[in-house]
Amino acid sequence: IVVHAAALKQVPAAEYNPDECIKTNINGAMNVINACIDNGIEKVIALSTDKAALPCNLYGATKLASDKLFTAANNMGGAAGTRFSVVRYGNVIGSRGSVVPFFEKLVKEGATQIPITDTRMTRFWITLDQAIDLVFEGFERMHGGEIFVPKIPSMRVTDLAEAIAPGVPHKVIGIRPGEKLHELMCPEESAHETLEFRNHFVITPATTYFGDFDYSVDGKGERGQPVEEGFEYKSSTNPHFLTVEELRDLCSVSASAVPVGFSGQKSQTSEGTASKSVH
């Protein structure tokens, strides 16, 4: 199996340097697809992002293109060929370039204000270990062509700032180039293609790539149900928001405190930064 986790992911940087983002996130995706087919890989999962759903920035647009390439790649493999699916999730706690280490650095430096882009901003939230668990569960459940979306909590950026820097005043500095106020993982426009399972959603392929799979029953035998018309899975309307105390625990104590995803089990694997083959 192969996990494709390589990407240029900094939203503002992509706005200023679109060519490098396109080369890595789109051309790089095609390189991985072709290499996997040429080498007879059985299953491939590409990591996606909430920014790929109705993207308003270049990074999200390149990841949407990557998602489309990986799901459509099932055509290239044929009925007995390589199977490709996608796992889409939100912000990974403490990942490189994320807001957690930035806030923590400010606290260590004795900052008297914490910069907040917008007090209304919300994000989906997941730990490193849980993100990896989702990938390996995806391998067990996939038929090929699906986009797996875990049910994960949301957080308010103001709550995160309070968790890391209690009592420190916030300074609103405005949204950065390409940023959204709220993130989306299942857009309303895909509701007719979306199935709900116990701990996750599946966005099914718009076209049949091969065979005659019933996507409502996954590879582990769990049956999903169609979502209601007009359904969307958005960080601002998510029924599960992390509290300040939960955020503080996640940032300072453990990266396994939130029971989310397919199995909710802790993995001992760290997040990768490139495509990986697992034997």
Predicted segments with their positions:
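Extended, charge-enriched "interface" segments that sit outside catalytic cores
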Residues: 1
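Conserved Rossmann-fold NAD(P)-dependent oxidoreductase catalytic core, especially the SDR/UDP-sugar
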Residues: 4, 8-64, 68, 72
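Strand-loop microenvironment adjacent to phosphate/nucleotide-handling motifs in alpha/beta enzyme folds
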Residues: 68, 72-279
